[in-house]
Amino acid sequence: PSCTDGLMAFLGRLAEERGLPVQSHLSENRAEMAWVRQLHPDCERYWEVYAKYGLWNSRTVMAHCVWSDEEERRAMREAGVTVVHCPDSNQNVFSGVAPVRVMLQEGLRVALGSDIAGGDHLSMFDNTASAIRASKARRMMDNWETSFLTVPEGWYLATSAGAAFFGDAPGFAPGNE
């Protein structure tokens, strides 16, 4: 919600013309979501604001997605948007606990990030541990119906899942960056 309509339109054109990736926030907290609805009454859903400006496609990375409901998750999956889960930040600024297991089960592309602006750690080891703890909290919130992330899954989200967005092969093979 910090960009004008003109800037959003420019960024959409620039990303399209140059094939650039786009990173932003989506459904991080309820106050932000209400603010976006006020700023864009023509868009029924938060994600539609990005789509309106050409910023909603397979080159899009959306951080947080804590409060993304089934419809928003479907829209992300269909567009090929990558979710970047930032558990340390989400916990630190009281955003909530993202339904990462549900996102993975629904076929969304999910990677792990630090969002150092709101989090405490740049270390992906620390953020992996935060993601696993957050998934355990989410499991309790979901009445024990979802499983929590395992260590291998957490490490995959911290490494190969993010690399896949940039077209790199998964794993720690020679030549991977």
Locations of regions flagged by a protein language model:
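Histidine/acidic residue-rich metal-binding segments in metalloenzymes
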Residues: 1-82, 94-110, 170
